[in-house]
């Protein structure tokens, strides 16, 4: 990884080491609701002592003692009758994930993702994808590639990913 890019990515951790970033992340987590993690702490439970919980989380992040908890595994049915495993993180882990997402997303949107990619991106949806396709067809392009990598997330080489992240 080139040094300027590496610096941009790795300075993100420092950007979440403040109560404002954690509060903003908390607002997203609360709005998304969601079930409790392995610690059985609900959104309502966490909110009862919000300031104390966020301060404690911030302290652990600053002291680099924060460790994510295991996820609570549940299975949801797929259309084909099979079951899809779903990992539910704890509230505090969701807050850290959201804080990092808040800081990383603008970088990836600008520097990494292709403008024509519309899947799972803020402000982009199937309707925009169709408009982009129609625009390209009107411009003279006549091929469209649509693909779905089956089991993509299940097959990410985690050792390689962790090596890149470290």
Predicted regions and their residues:
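Conserved S-adenosyl-L-methionine
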Residues: 162
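Carboxylate/His-rich catalytic cores and anion/metal-binding grooves
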Residues: 165
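Intein modules and their embedded homing endonuclease domains
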Residues: 49-52, 56-59
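Non-catalytic, polymerase-adjacent accessory regions of viral genome-replication enzymes
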Residues: 1-51
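Active-site-proximal segment of RNA-dependent polymerases
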Residues: 2, 11-14, 104-158
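Short, conserved non-catalytic motifs in the polymerase core
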Residues: 31-44, 68-95, 112-124, 145-146
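Reverse-transcriptase-like RNA-dependent polymerase core
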Residues: 17-27, 60-83, 91, 95-104, ...
């Amino acid at each position: 990884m080139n040094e300027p890019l590496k610096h941009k990515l790795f300075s993100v951790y420092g950007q979440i080491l403040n109560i404002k970033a954690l509060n903003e992340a908390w607002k997203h987590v609360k709005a998304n609701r969601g079930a409790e993690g392995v610690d059985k702490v609900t959104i309502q439970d966490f909110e009862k002592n919000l300031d104390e919980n966020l301060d404690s989380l911030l302290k652990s992040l600053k002291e680099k003692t924060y460790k994510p908890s295991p996820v609570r595994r549940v299975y949801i049915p797929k259309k084909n009758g099979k079951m899809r495993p779903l990992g539910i993180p704890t509230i505090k882990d969701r807050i850290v994930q959201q804080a990092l997402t808040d800081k990383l997303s603008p970088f990836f949107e600008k520097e990494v993702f292709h403008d024509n990619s519309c899947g799972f991106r803020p402000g982009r949806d199937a309707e925009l994808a169709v408009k982009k396709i129609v625009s390209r067809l009107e411009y003279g392009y006549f091929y469209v590639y649509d693909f779905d990598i089956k089991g993509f997330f299940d097959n990410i080489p985690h050792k390689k990913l962790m090596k890149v992240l470290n």
